[in-house]
Design a protein with these regions (language model features):
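Active-site loop segments of alpha/beta catalytic cores
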Residues: 1-29, 36-37, 50, 61, ...
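Active-site-flanking structural segment that lines cofactor/substrate pockets
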Residues: 33-58
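Alpha/beta catalytic barrel-like cores
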Residues: 25-32, 61-94, 98
Length: 332
């Protein structure tokens, strides 16, 4: 086992380390390409090339493998439905559907190209996110999910459970067949006041838990990402019992430090600390300021159960030297 692999897995388990691991990642394609890779191999090739360059230049402690191009869940019934009630009889695509198999092939290809042995976690979205993106064109759709709940919550739950079964199959296959170490499951509260915590737990959470349970069943080392994309705010308490080894959220916008998160998530490993946007310290700050922030995070959170990273994906044009500054300051 390589030193980096041993270091990261120790941190995932909350064990003692001699250096706090660091994990940052970004997209390798543009937002208008995220939904269209399944039918456009050029997008997948672009994603592969981006991973290769990133891993060679950053030499990361571990990597999140990006699912760019596969954001569109290819359920034919989603193309032209008038009401959520129209979808009450849909069935899963199946574990061997080409959309799933193509992602297994992607992960195999990416890992085969690694220049060293590092932990790799594959990006997976919550079932409701796949639905939301299709109806809301990537950013948006929360109001439509709330509309569906008002219209026919039983039908929506069925749809999410069906998607969840396929995403569970995808998670299992990328771990067991493709060789990734686990999944990075991205969840997000519905940004509509009509969707209470109770409704979320009843209608949406079961499909998310199905995915995590499948990944755990495949012996994955899994990260739960509570996504603050484009300013989304989350009810962190909704996710405190989700069975992931590592948890990541937007510490600034949510007003919950990593140290507080250790308590909320009952001592499970926490990941983050830096704002991810172009206005944040990681992107704009001096080496001194960035390294002072690293030491502050470590002093506040402790060295057990900590991985330093960002709220979400960082800008794709960031100077990779900045990531190395973080790693230098994380040596204990």
């Amino acid at each position: 086992m390589s030193e980096k692999r041993e270091l990261v897995l120790k941190a995932f388990r909350g064990e003692s380390v001699d250096r706090v691991p660091v994990g940052f990642w970004h997209h390798f394609t543009t937002e208008d390409e995220w939904l269209h890779g399944f039918e456009n191999p050029e997008i997948i090739d672009k994603n592969k090339a981006g991973h290769k360059k990133f891993i060679e230049e950053v030499k990361p402690d571990f990597v999140k493998l990006m699912s760019d191009g596969f954001f569109a869940y290819p359920q034919p019934a989603f193309k032209d439905f008038k009401s959520i009630s129209d979808l009450q009889t849909i069935e899963p695509l199946g574990a061997n559907h080409p959309w799933i198999s193509a992602q297994v092939d992607l992960v195999k290809s990416l890992i085969a190209d690694f220049p060293e042995d590092i932990v790799a976690i594959y990006n997976i979205f919550a079932p409701v996110t796949y639905l939301k993106w299709l109806v809301g064109k990537v950013s948006g759709g929360d109001d439509l999910i709330a509309d569906y709940i008002v219209e026919n919550r039983k039908a929506l739950k069925h749809v999410l459970d069906v998607i969840g079964e396929d995403i569970a199959s995808l998670s299992q296959r990328v771990i067991e067949e493709a060789g990734t170490d686990g999944i990075y499951l991205s969840v997000q509260s519905i940004q509509d006041e009509r969707v209470s915590a109770e409704i979320y737990k009843e209608i949406i959470a079961p499909s998310e838990l199905k995915v995590l349970e499948a990944a755990n069943g495949a012996k994955g080392h899994n990260i739960l990402h509570i996504c603050g994309y484009e300013g989304a705010r989350n009810n962190i308490e909704l996710f405190k019992d989700y069975p992931a080894q590592v948890v990541n959220w937007a510490v600034g916008p949510e007003g919950i430090s990593l140290a507080k998160g250790l308590n909320i998530f009952r001592g499970r490993t926490v990941l983050g600390g830096f704002e991810n946007g172009k206005d944040g310290l990681l992107y704009t700050g001096t080496k001194k300021a960035i390294q002072e922030k690293v030491r502050e995070i470590i002093a506040d959170t402790g060295t057990h159960g900590l991985i330093i990273g960002a709220d979400c994906t960082i800008p794709s044009d960031i100077n990779y030297e900045r990531i190395e500054w973080v790693r230098e300051a994380a040596i204990l």
